[in-house]
Amino acid sequence: VLGIGFYPAAAALFPRFHDRGWMFSKVLGIVVSGFAVFALGSFGLVPFTAPVCLITVGVLILASWIFGCFKVRVHAPEIDFLMMEEVLFFAFFLLWTYLAGFHPEAHGTEKFMDYGFMKAMMRSTAVPAEDLWYSGSGINYYYGGQFYAVFLTKITFTDVKQTYHLMRTMVASFAFVLPFSITYHLAESRACHRIRKEGGNKSQIAPVLGGLLSGGAVSLAGNMHYVIYGCIRQWLGLNESAYWFPSSTRYIGYDPLVENDRTIHEFPSYSFVLGDLHAHVVNVMFVLLVLGLLYSYVKNTCRDPEKEWKWSLKDVLLQPQIIAAGFLIGVFHWSNYW
């Protein structure tokens, strides 16, 4: 519903995409409507309740369609491409939901904290909600990711015990289909540019394969740590103990040990498997939306590859894609302040 409601706005931001931003409209609807409720609640203008969330969503959807009817002229989306994206999204949503079922308990790492924040926000009508550990004080944390999960929970009249895992599997699905869409259009634009110069026939094989590869790289792949430490070193008999999958995020500065120079790299698929619904996890789909907006801006600006770009700061800053990306980067300071 959010995707349909915000489709006119997305179509204005992705005019040269085959689906006119259909898949991105879902994320756009979540981030804009959720932030509107958060902002109104933070100023004490409205309570954080399901009716208020639904009214806010309804007003924004109405504004999107009024804007679309009177201000935007776009071509209809290509249904075949749109359906391909929907099938991929649903397939990976089912896949990640199935995997989440192997360890559904909110136990270990930061799952209890994430679950606790969500339950506190479900009980509360104020923004921020009362801290579950520091009673009498509001949550003092970058809790935007959990807030969006609770926002979707309230507008669907469900409970955290049902939506905790559905939120993380939805993000994992977006982590596949949004890179697929971006890379598909990148590869196709490259192929069209080559055909214009050298001639030949247009093929969809390379764009589709490129999209599947990039989607798999973000949603499923990680790094080469398991290949080296879990397979090769194990086969050579160099590992002293059994392989522990979180080690793949803790080897820079850890192996070999380097004092005062260590880092933790929690790539998306690690977090999806681990089960934390933390800020950096939910923010993955918002970051991909920013990347899509930036590519849409480039694709929309560079209509003639042979023509030299004439940059004007004023023109750049007034482009809708840049304005939307600026808004999202501002949201990141609340949703993932890393």
Model-predicted segments: where are they?
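Transmembrane alpha-helical segments of multipass membrane enzymes and assembly factors
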Residues: 5-21, 38, 42, 71-72, ...
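Membrane-embedded, hydrophobic transmembrane alpha-helices
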Residues: 1-80
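Short hydrophobic alpha-helices at membrane interfaces in multi-pass membrane enzymes
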Residues: 301-330
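Membrane-interfacial entry segments at the cytosolic side of transmembrane helices
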Residues: 46-52, 76-83, 199-209, 315-317
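Hydrophobic, membrane-inserted alpha-helices
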Residues: 7, 33-41, 148-153, 268, ...
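Membrane-interface alpha helices of multi-pass inner-membrane proteins
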Residues: 271-274, 323-336
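Hydrophobic alpha-helical transmembrane segments
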Residues: 23-27, 82, 86-90, 212-216, ...
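Active-site lumenal/periplasmic loops and adjacent helix-entry segments of GT-C-fold
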Residues: 81-84, 91-289, 294
